[in-house]
Amino acid sequence: GTLHSQLSSCYLTTVPDDLYGIYGAMRDNAMLSKWAGGLGNDWTPVRGMGAHIKGTNGRSQGVVPFLKVVNDTAVAVNQGGKRKGAVCAYLETWHLDIEEFLELRKNTGDDRRRTHDMNTANWIPDLFMERVMNKETWTLFSPNEAKDLHDLTGNEFKEQYEKYEEEAKKGNIKAHKEVDAEELWRKII
C-alpha cells in the first residue's frame, strides 16, 4: 500500500477558458501526479490563437504555450519519484489550434512550442471524415465563438458546425480558418 492511496490511477479533466481555471487545472495536475496519478486534460474549451480576449482587449496565444507549462510540470513532479509523470492533452479536430497541436511532439521547430514528454490525442467527428473522403474543406473555430460544438455529437454536431461555417462566411465569426480536410487528416496520421 501507499500512504496516499487513490481511488483511481488516471484522472480526466476539462480545462476552462480563463486564467484561474487554466492554472487551477495545472495545480490539480501537479497534485494528482504527486500521488502517482496519470492525467488526461481536455483543452478544447480554451480559446484559439488570435481569438479576442474581452478582459484585456488583447489576443489569445492559444493552447500551446499552456501545454508547454503542463509538459514541464509533469516532468518536474514525476509522480512522486516513482515513475515519469504521465499526461495527455486532448483537442477536438475543429479547434483553431489543431494544426499547431499536431506539431507539439515533433523534434524540429521552436522548442518553446514543443512538448516532448506529453502525449497528445484528438477527437474526430464523423463529419470530418466525410469531408476527407469527399475531398472538401474543413473549418477550424475558436471555442469562444463556437461555444456549444464541444458538447454536441452526430447530427446535432453536423447541423451546428455547418451553421457556424455559414456565420464565418458572413463575417460574424472572427477567429476561424478554412483548411483542406484531407491535408489536415495527413497531419493527424
Regions found by a protein language model. Give the residues of each.
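Active-site cavity-forming subdomains of large catalytic enzyme subunits
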Residues: S8-I189
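N-terminal flexible segment immediately upstream of the FAD-binding catalytic core
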Residues: G1-S8
